[in-house]
Amino acid sequence: MRVYPSFFCHHHLFFYGFVFSRKELFMIFIDMDGVIANHVRDDYIGENPKFLQPHYFASCEPNPTIIAFVHLLQEFQIPYLFLSRVSPPLNYRESTMDKCKWLFEFVPGSNVIFTQDSKVQTAQHWLGRNLQADDILIDDFNPNLEEWENAGATAIKFLNGNNSPDTWHRTASNITELIECYNHHGSHIN
């Protein structure tokens, strides 16, 4: 697989990382906020929540479970992308640059797509095809999971300590559960 460092920007879509074949048989998409970066509930509360402050993401702690899972994906050369929605009122450019720096520090060599649009539409646009059952999204937010499954793909709810396992049928909170979910819907990590 040939890879090239690149920037890709189209409409409200920004990609940074290494380009590889978009015709992959399947793809794993991983959310950032509340999945690879720990979610702190208090940071989202109040009139002037902390998450709206400049460079907030730089202070987020990495989730060791997802870091370990990404290292497995890298070891087995399983295609994955981080897919992060950056919504107003956040400063789009500042937020995306902070997240790129954060990924470079904690999981170098990772690819990321930022969008202000639907994660499904963004993934389909990037892949150049409709989502299919083997395309997996690991996210912590039910509306993203619902939209993903409604598009015919597989959604895994990552339990981060702030969300409920009772509101989704396919969940994972540790490396073993993530591997089991992946093995059930993708190829296999042994």
Model-derived regions: residue spans:
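Acidic, Mg2+-coordinating phosphoryl-transfer loop and its flanking beta/alpha structural elements
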Residues: 136-171
